[in-house]
């Protein structure tokens, strides 16, 4: 059975784990506590067991030493061995070739194995071992006799069993307390994470970009603040996108409507039986169509450049701003060969987006050329401000920009009343500002001739970078080197 392309799609998020993070934290706490409890229990059991066995061995050694040093074994061995029956030990005295004396507790028999036989035969001086649930000590005496003493391990085993029970209960309580504490800590610690999760789900479900309240100053508070920064950036991006779409639609509607009207007139004039239009009107319509197509092309190009700058992801590279100015001047000069350019530039390198910087400089020059009268002059200067910054100044002899509009001209699609009669999309200076700010620079607008009539406009573009070593030389727009040390060069 064949499935159509793209017929299968996941219906929801894939599960990441069978256990929630809270349960995993609690299980981790339980596991760590259980491991510590087991290690401590084993250590305590081993230490106590060793201590009990050492105490039992010391008791056997003390009892044997007491019997030997008292002399009762030599004086009356039978009575001395019988006396041990009233204590808690089993005893045996072996006198080779004569007799064996024994005294056992009720229900017990002193074990006699190979180690004890080796002591009796004199092959070993002493042996100590565990046999038949008893601790057995055998000592070979100086007179050739052998003394054997044993004691039941039942009391010791009972103490160790009780100790194991206590350790098990205490360990279980510790693990349970650790589970409860781990759950409480996980619940309290993951509460901000839960708020972040709810916020993310709310954003995905409703597009609600309200920030989350930040509580405290710990790592989770920093995570919340970072998430809020992401929400603010997303809100700004959506606002810019909506504004761009709205403004672009508005700006495209006018030239498209005019273009459609002109095309319909041209088509109607070509229909059979239609009255012919005068040639001058036909030429005017065709010129209008071409102008409107060029306006649309410019607007679409500006929109592409603007969205390109918004998208980012551009690999920076060293850019020689003098070369950028040279190339931009060549393009502007082809469009406006009726004005002169006074160029005074130095070698200055900026680490950034070559295409974006070129577009910014070209827009400044285009704007200055657009507002300059025929035969006017446009000044282009690139000079060093300090050891880290240089400034590009583009000056024209146009009507200037009123102070109240100098901030607005960098807004997208903003066009003053005077600018609406001129070609353009209202995006040129917005692109300039976006490029300059992305490179860590700044923009300002002054009058070319303060108080003049017309005052003109000078746009100052400050860019960080470094000087390109070229002592005693200034580059012109034509690419030659002027050895006069930075004099103004006029090009046409």
UniProtKB/Swiss-Prot annotation:
GO terms for molecular function: ATP binding; phosphoprotein phosphatase activity; phosphorelay sensor kinase activity. Residues 247-467 form the Histidine kinase domain. The modification Phosphohistidine is found at residue 250. It is a multi-pass membrane protein. The chain crosses the membrane at residues 28-48, 166-186. Its cofactor is Mg(2+); Mn(2+). Residues 1-27, 187-492 are cytoplasmic. The gene is mprB. This is Signal transduction histidine-protein kinase/phosphatase MprB. It comes from Mycolicibacterium smegmatis (strain ATCC 700084 / mc(2)155) (Mycobacterium smegmatis). Autophosphorylated. Keywords: ATP-binding, Cell membrane, Hydrolase, Kinase, Magnesium, Manganese, Membrane, Nucleotide-binding, Phosphoprotein, Protein phosphatase, Stress response, Transferase, Transmembrane, Transmembrane helix, Two-component regulatory system, Virulence. Residues 49-165 are extracellular. Pfam families: HAMP, HATPase_c, HisKA. It is found in: Cell membrane. Residues 470-492 are annotated as: Disordered. It comes from the Bacteria. Its EC number is 2.7.13.3, 3.1.3.-. Its main location: membrane. One of its GO terms (cellular component) is plasma membrane. The keyword ATP-binding applies. Member of the two-component regulatory system MprB/MprA which contributes to maintaining a balance among several systems involved in stress resistance and is required for establishment and maintenance of persistent infection in the host. In response to environmental signals MprB acts both as a membrane-associated protein kinase that undergoes autophosphorylation and subsequently transfers the phosphate to MprA, and a protein phosphatase that dephosphorylates phospho-MprA. The keyword Disulfide bond does not apply. Residues 187-239 form the HAMP domain. It catalyses: ATP + protein L-histidine = ADP + protein N-phospho-L-histidine. SMART domains: HAMP, HATPase_c, HisKA.
């Amino acid at each position: 059975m064949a499935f159509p392309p793209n017929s299968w799609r996941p219906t929801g998020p894939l599960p990441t784990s069978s256990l929630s993070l809270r349960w995993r934290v609690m299980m981790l706490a339980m596991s760590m506590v259980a491991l510590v409890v087991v290690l401590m229990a084993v250590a305590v059991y081993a230490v106590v067991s060793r201590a009990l066995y050492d105490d039992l061995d010391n008791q056997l050694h003390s009892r044997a030493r007491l019997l030997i040093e008292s002399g009762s074994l030599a004086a009356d061995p039978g009575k001395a061995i019988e006396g041990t029956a009233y204590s808690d030990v089993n005893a045996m005295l072996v006198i080779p070739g004569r007799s064996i004396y024994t005294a056992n507790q009720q229900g017990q028999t002193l074990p006699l194995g190979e180690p004890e036989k080796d002591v009796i035969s004199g092959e070993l001086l002493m042996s100590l071992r565990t046999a038949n649930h008893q601790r057995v000590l055998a000592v070979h005496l100086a007179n050739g006799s052998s003394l054997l003493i044993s004691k039941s391990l039942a009391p010791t085993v009972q103490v160790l069993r009780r100790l194991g029970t206590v350790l098990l209960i205490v360990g279980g309580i510790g693990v349970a307390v650790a589970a409860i504490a781990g759950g409480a800590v996980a619940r309290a610690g993951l509460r901000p994470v839960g708020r972040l999760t709810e916020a993310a789900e709310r954003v995905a479900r409703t597009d609600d970009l309200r920030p989350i309240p930040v509580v405290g100053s710990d790592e989770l508070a920093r995570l919340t603040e970072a998430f809020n920064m992401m929400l603010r950036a997303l809100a700004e991006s959506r606002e810019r996108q909506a504004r761009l779409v709205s403004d672009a639609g508005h700006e495209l509607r006018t030239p498209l409507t005019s273009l459609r009207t002109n095309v319909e007139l041209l088509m109607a004039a070509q229909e059979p039986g239609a009255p012919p239009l005068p040639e001058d009107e036909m030429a005017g319509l065709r010129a209008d169509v071409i102008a409107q197509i060029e306006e649309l092309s410019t607007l679409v190009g500006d929109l592409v450049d603007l969205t390109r700058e918004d998208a980012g992801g551009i690999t920076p590279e060293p850019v020689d701003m003098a070369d950028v100015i040279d190339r931009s001047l060549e393009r502007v000069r082809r469009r406006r060969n009726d004005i002169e350019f006074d160029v005074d530039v130095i070698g200055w390198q900026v680490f950034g987006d070559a295409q974006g910087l070129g577009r910014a400089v070209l827009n400044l020059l285009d704007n200055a050329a657009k507002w300059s009268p025929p035969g006017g002059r446009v000044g282009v200067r690139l000079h060093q401000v300090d050891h880290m910054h240089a400034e590009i100044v583009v000056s024209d002899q146009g009507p200037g920009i009123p102070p109240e509009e100098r901030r607005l001209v960098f807004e997208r699609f903003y066009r003053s009343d005077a600018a609406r009669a001129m070609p353009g999309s209202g995006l040129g200076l917005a692109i300039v500002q976006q490029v300059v700010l992305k490179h860590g620079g700044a923009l300002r607008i002054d009058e070319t001739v303060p108080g003049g009539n017309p005052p003109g406009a000078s746009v100052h573009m400050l860019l960080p970078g470094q000087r390109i070593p070229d002592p005693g030389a200034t580059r012109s727009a034509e690419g030659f080197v002027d050895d006069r040390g930075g004099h103004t060069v006029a090009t046409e």
